[in-house]
Amino acid sequence: MMTDSSVYVLFADGFEEIEAVTPVDILRRMELDVVLVGVTGKQVRGAHGMELTMDRTLNQLKNQTPAAVILPGGMPGTRNLDATRPVGELVCRTAEAGGVVGAICAAPMVIGRLGLLRGRRATCFPGFEEHLLGAEKVSDRVVTDGRFVTAAGAGVAADFAFAVGTLLKDSVSAAFVRRSMQFSD
């Protein structure tokens, strides 16, 4: 059962900045409650040196189950997410409760290694396909299968965010924000 209507974006040291910040921005423009969650602490440093202050840390969330959880890619950020057991527990709880699970770039490996992509279509950054256990690997840049959204990398961070937002809200809201930000239809 979901205990929090928020979207949790998980930040681990070494996260890919565009893949993390773009979904935060777009989903907030869609008037969703987005919480920046630090996996490795309250201050988290990205793969390219950007340092961000988190709203909450993973330890503060206890057994919360959000409406959605987003895993940005980047290295070593993805490996840090994958190595943190409470991340897997949170992702599994969210999926079991019918929440949205989104992962971009290398991060689909985290949900793939948890077995959550079995029988689903999924994509990821080239070279990480072996971790999409049981998934139908496709070369599309953004893939939505049920309540799961996967994406290939930084260049599609906005499309990824709009796909997540469409599942959480609706396509009309996503299209409105997309147009207001001057994205082409």
Language model feature labels by segment:
Residues 36-38, 101-105, 120-125:
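Short, hydrophobic beta-strand segments that form beta-sheet elements in well-ordered domains
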Residues 1-97, 110-113, 118-119, 131-139, ...:
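Extended, subdomain-level signal for the structured scaffold at the beginning of enzyme domains
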Residues 143-148:
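Beta-strand-turn-beta hairpins that frame and shape the catalytic cleft
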